[in-house]
């Protein structure tokens, strides 16, 4: 009878340990998913910021180009 009790105890113990390991792996997987989602959100925010900077640079480039053309016209055709 003692042998059966020890065997049953061992089986239950191993089952609990394996269950605990599975739950830990599940938690780690969920944490990784959350981190990936946060990284995607950050990359979307970074893309928005980059687009805003590119739009500003484009506007500045247009203004500088117009000024350069005006200066070149005045230098080539003085009146």
Curated annotation (Swiss-Prot):
InterPro entries: Frog_antimicrobial_propeptide (IPR004275), FSAP (IPR016322). Keywords: Amphibian defense peptide, Antibiotic, Antimicrobial, Cleavage on pair of basic residues, Secreted, Signal. Residues 23-49 form a propeptide. Expressed by the skin glands. GO terms for cellular component: extracellular region. It is found in: Secreted. GO terms for biological process: defense response to bacterium. Pfam families: FSAP_sig_propep. Residues 1-22 form the signal peptide. Has antibacterial activity. Belongs to the frog skin active peptide (FSAP) family. Dermaseptin subfamily. This is Raniseptin-3. It comes from Boana raniceps.
